[in-house]
Amino acid sequence: MAEKPLFHYDEARGRMESVRWLLAAAGVEYEEKFIHTNEDLEKLRSDGVLMFQQVPMVEVDGMKLVQTRAIMNYFSSKYNLYGKDMKERALIDMYSEGLADLNEMFILYPFDPPGVKEANIALMKEKATNRYFPAFEKVFESHGQDYLVGNKLSKADVHLVEMIYNMEELDTNILANFPLLQALKTRISDMPTIKKFLQPGSQRQPPVDEKSIQKTRKIFKF
């Protein structure tokens, strides 16, 4: 039996949370070795297992993969969440890269100083409701299918629903004008493995709070 993938990252959402969502959708079990201190991180660096001295890192299939998008693409290919041909993969990548822009803002805003944080929350909500969510709603309107590409679940659908949940933490009514995105959220949330992932006690990480912010700052020294 193949070993489970092993994640190395802070015990937080950060850049690993999208990978957690993806493997939940694929129904794949994994293990996590959390980095709790700067010393834990420095040991990984001194052991030479972090190609660019950065985490996340995933041990899988004899590899030590770094760079979140490379990790996502590998698992998407392995578990058939990456389209059937080059054209479908191009669309999946295009949608995923757009979502990555919004996700980057979401990952970083908790570390902003007061004033800046509130401004960035307002900016994220504005971009979600006026740029990103309308674009994806239009995709579903254009083809009338259940999923973004090829009428089959892909990493783009999973990442979109992850971002919907993230943005709903900032505004519970943010999907009010996007019925097709509401339907996608329900569809994916009802998948047994995602339903389990959304329950308390799963490997899904909770929203960032002040304690986790301070811990992350100490680990990464910023």
Curated annotation (Swiss-Prot):
It holds the Pfam family GST_C_3. Glutathione binds at residues 9, 45, 54-55, 67-68. It is an enzyme of class 2 (transferase). InterPro entries: Glutathione-S-Trfase_C-like (IPR010987), Glutathione-S-Trfase_C_sf (IPR036282), Glutathione_S-Trfase_N (IPR004045), GST_alpha (IPR003080), GST_C (IPR004046), GST_superfamily (IPR050213), Thioredoxin-like_sf (IPR036249). Transmembrane segments: none annotated. Keywords: Cytoplasm, Transferase. It catalyses: RX + glutathione = an S-substituted glutathione + a halide anion + H(+). It comes from the Eukaryota. PROSITE patterns: GST_CTER, GST_NTER. The keyword Transcription regulation does not apply. It is found in: Cytoplasm. Residues 85-208 form the GST C-terminal domain. One of its GO terms (cellular component) is cytosol. SUPFAM superfamilies: GST C-terminal domain-like, Thioredoxin-like. Residues 3-83 form the GST N-terminal domain. GO terms for molecular function: glutathione transferase activity. Its EC number is 2.5.1.18. GO terms for biological process: glutathione metabolic process; xenobiotic metabolic process. The keyword Cytoplasm applies. Homodimer or heterodimer of GSTA1 and GSTA2. Conjugation of reduced glutathione to a wide number of exogenous and endogenous hydrophobic electrophiles. Belongs to the GST superfamily. Alpha family. This is Glutathione S-transferase A6. The gene is Gsta6.
